[in-house]
Amino acid sequence: MTPAQATAELLAVNEQLRTAIDALPIIANTYDRKRAQTFKDLIAAGESTTSAREWATTHCLDESFDQARAKALVESLRERQALLVFLLEHDLLS
């Protein structure tokens, strides 16, 4: 894999990660967030994109198969993202 290929893949992984996080169902544990069912609900309630994504990924439901699968997808994409960033930062690609 060349650095250009890794960079292109990292951009694709970042987009997939954003899409996966946007779709995560969440549990609201504060008064302001109790009405939020999805990431997009948090944004509509005035949360910043960054804080809403972070909050949604740490509070997603994992009781059902679909929700657990969505959480696993996010975790997998984050691992791939971290690997690509590491390889690029340390110039380990040919």
Label each residue range with its predicted role.
Residues 24-54:
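Extended alpha-helical coiled-coil "stalk/arm" regions
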Residues 44-73:
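Short, glycine/alanine-rich amphipathic alpha-helical segment
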Residues 21-24, 28, 65-94:
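Long amphipathic alpha-helical coiled-coil segments
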Residues 1-15:
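Short, charge-rich amphipathic alpha-helices with coiled-coil/heptad character
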Residues 15, 36-40, 44, 61, ...:
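Generic surface-pattern signal
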Residues 11, 56-59, 88:
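Intrinsic disorder/low-complexity signature
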